[in-house]
Structure formats: structure tokens, C-alpha cells
Regions:
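An alpha-helical support segment within catalytic cores of ATP-dependent transferases
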Residues: 9-25, 108, 117, 130-198, ...
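Short, flexible/disordered intra-domain loops and linkers
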Residues: 2-6, 60-70, 285-291
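Active-site acidic catalytic loop and adjacent metal/ATP-binding pocket
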Residues: 34, 39-45, 53-54, 94, ...
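Short strand-connecting beta-turns/loops that link adjacent beta-strands
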Residues: 47-49, 99, 209-212, 270-273
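Short, surface-exposed alpha-helical segments at coil->helix boundaries
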Residues: 11-12, 73-76, 242-246
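Helix-rich C-terminal or lid/interface subdomains of diverse kinases
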Residues: 33, 160-161, 189-191, 221-224, ...
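ATP-binding pocket architecture of kinase catalytic cores
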Residues: 31-156, 165-167
Length: 307
């Protein structure tokens, strides 16, 4: 099912974007790629031998969550930043970009699936650790999206924006008043705004034919903050702190998870579940399909842990 945020593109439109970005190029083959639910993504083979990816963002008429505004340019920012500051981490090269679309090189490999490719997961952990050495200018998102002078302020703003979006979309959430504020002190222990990918679920991690890490894609949701936030999506719907032999952790090599770290991880799962619940209507997902109730159950479990 196509998400309401994904524009329907013809090959002619893709060729027009390529001409705008790359000039006079001949397209010998092009096809839409599946897997995402936000933008529309095509793969194109050019007569000069290059294979590229064309990503086109939502139409201006599409309703988006607050933090999603401007994410197509943000992806270009992320790729350029990583290639400049962490060149050993495989991300696409940006060939051209605008406010509405981005053209990048095509990375080899296939998305992670299930429990396969432990070597790729280990190498992913090491790559993310390298990315976390990059320090940002502030906490939170870039532009006029939620951010703050410190991590407690920024994180509270991020969650508050999602709650406001949920209210606007009439998406029910469990009571959340005061939860973030009660844990101000553990959040305040984060003093450096590290570069975070945030969206490290299996579909955004590419595996080479030999089983190693081939690439990270879809960095448009990046922000700056606590490195622990990036430890949530690699073990989606699970508690990675309870899986010490998880290959991602063996590659990342975090400090031992003390009580404060476990509390922060619980807060970051809360954030992810609030986001996933809230984005349902914008993606055309019916509340009756079971997803809303499943995510609400996970969210309530984290709330019980947080007290």
C-alpha cells in the first residue's frame, strides 16, 4: 500500500529530476524501489555506466509530522557530513539535491532481514560508534524543528511535538504528562550532542554478498543527542540492554548499562513508540489493523518501567 506521503512518479518525472540534477543524461533503465513509507524512491541506470537513486519527497499538500518538515534536504546534509567526518562509514554520495528531491549513488547490497548477517550487524555497531564521535552544534534536530540548549530540553521538545501531532491527528496515546520531566536528571547526564542516525532498522542497513556491512541509507531523520538513542532501532521492539551478545553491541562496545542508562533507553523506546503510533494516519494505516494496539502495549510496558 502506498503511503499518502509518497508521490506517484512516472519514468518521465524521474528523468526530469535527473536532468535537473545531473544535466543531459541518458536513462537506460529505471524502476521504483519498495520498502519505505515516506518518500518515493527510484533506481536508475545511466548510459555512462552510473547507477543512481532518485528520492522524491512528499507533495506540498501532504500532511506531515512536525519533525518531518525539511527532511529531504536533511538527508543530503547527513550524507555529506558523514562522508566528510567519518569517511570509512558507507553512506551514499550526494550527486544533486533540492528541497524536494535528492540524487545519490546506489550502494551495493540488500537490506538486512531477520536474524541474518551477524557480521554486518557487528560492523554496523562499529560504524555507529564512529558516527557518534561527531559532535553537533546543538541538541535535537536541525532547522526550525524541535531542538534545545541541552539534552533534557531538546528531548522534551521532540516528544512534545509528537504529542501535539497526535492530538492534531486525533491519535490516542496513553497519559504521558510528567514522564520526561521526572527523569530530567538522567537525561542531563548527556553533555555532548553526538550525531545520531536514529532510523537504524533493518531496512536501512545494507549487507554485502559476503555478509559484511555495505551501507547505511535514509539518514534524513538525523539529530544530535545521546548516543544511546541509536541503540533502540537496531533491536526494534526489544530491549538491547538485555541482549549482551547482540552482534550490534559487540561491534559498538558500549559502557556497561547502569540504572541511568537503562532508564534513558526506556525513554528512547517510549519516544520511538509514540512516533510510530502518531505517524499511522499520515501513512494511511488504519487503527483497526492491530498495529496501534501492539505499539500501545509496548509503550505501556515502558511507562510501567519508568514509573
Amino acid at each position: 500500500m502506498r503511503s499518502p506521503t509518497q508521490p506517484t512518479l512516472s519514468r518521465a518525472v524521474v528523468e526530469s529530476v535527473l536532468a535537473d540534477g545531473l544535466g543531459a543524461v541518458e536513462v537506460v533503465d529505471a524502476a521504483e524501489l519498495s520498502g519505505g513509507t515516506f518518500a518515493t524512491v527510484w533506481r536508475a541506470a545511466l548510459a555512462d555506466g552510473r547507477e543512481v537513486v532518485v528520492k522524491v519527497g512528499p507533495l506540498p499538500s501532504a500532511r506531515l509530522l512536525t519533525y518531518e518538515k525539511g527532511v529531504i534536504p536533511a538527508e543530503a546534509e547527513y550524507c555529506r557530513l558523514v562522508r566528510d567526518r567519518a569517511p570509512d562509514v558507507p553512506v551514499p554520495s550526494v550527486l544533486a539535491a533540492s528541497d524536494d528531491w535528492i540524487i545519490t549513488t546506489l550502494l551495493p547490497g540488500r537490506p538486512l532481514a531477520g536474524q541474518d548477517a551477524p557480521r554486518a550487524r557487528l560492523e554496523l555497531g562499529a560504524a555507529v560508534a564512529a558516527l557518534h564521535e561527531i559532535t553537533g552544534p546543538h541538541f535535537g534536530y536541525t532547522g526550525d524543528r524541535p531542538s534545545g540548549r541541552d539534552w533534557p530540553t531538546a528531548f522534551a521538545a521532540v516528544v512534545a511535538a509528537l504529542r501535539a501531532d497526535a492530538a492534531a491527528w486525533k491519535v490516542p496515546l496513553p497519559p504521558l504528562d510528567g514522564v520526561i520531566e521526572r527523569h530530567h536528571d538522567v537525561l542531563a547526564a548527556v553533555s555532548r550532542p553526538a550525531l545520531l542516525h536514529f532510523d537504524l532498522w533493518d531496512g536501512n542497513v545494507l549487507v554485502s554478498p559476503s555478509g559484511g556491512l555495505a551501507g547505511l541509507v535514509d539518514g534524513e531523520r538525523y539529530l544530535y543527542g545521546d548516543p544511546l538513542l541509536d541503540l533502540v532501532s537496531p533491536a526494534l521492539f526489544r530491549r538491547i540492554e538485555d541482549e549482551p551478545e547482540h552482534p550490534f553491541l559487540r561491534g559498538y562496545r558500549p559502557e556497561p548499562f547502569d540504572a541511568a542508562a537503562r532508564t534513558r533507553l526506556s525513554l528512547y523506546r517510549l519516544h520511538l513508540y509514540v512516533l510510530m503510533i502518531t505517524e499511522g494516519p499520515s501513512r494511511g494505516i488504519r487503527r483497526t489493523d492491530g498495529r496501534h494496539d501492539y505499539l500501545t502495549g509496548l509503550l505501556n510496558a515502558e511507562l510501567a518501567l519508568l514509573g
